[in-house]
């Protein structure tokens, strides 16, 4: 699937992530479309920061954000996912591309 089609299906206007060679097509699409505009695309230092940024975006806008990462970054999202996204805490919806 092409990155443009994936983005159209997801229909989000906020992406944050840690670039990865396996996600090169998506990263290139996001850079070409949004660049590093903090209203739409933020490249973060680690995956846990991405989840926190996306959670803040949702709390501020009510919209569903997207987090992209390589599979080795899953361990870095455990704490923010368990605390911020849990339905008994804030119940924040989020799309993950791994």
Where are these regions (language model features)?
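Thiamine diphosphate
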Residues: 1-98
């Amino acid at each position: 699937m092409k990155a443009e089609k994936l983005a159209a299906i997801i229909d989000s206007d906020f992406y944050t992530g840690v670039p990865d060679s396996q996600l090169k097509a998506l990263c290139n699409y996001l850079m070409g479309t949004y660049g590093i505009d903090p209203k739409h695309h933020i490249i973060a230092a680690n995956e846990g920061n991405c989840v926190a940024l996306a959670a803040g975006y949702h709390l501020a806008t009510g919209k569903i954000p997207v987090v992209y990462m390589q599979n080795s970054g899953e361990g870095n999202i455990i704490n923010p996912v368990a605390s911020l996204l849990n339905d008994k805490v804030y119940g924040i919806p989020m799309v993950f591309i791994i």
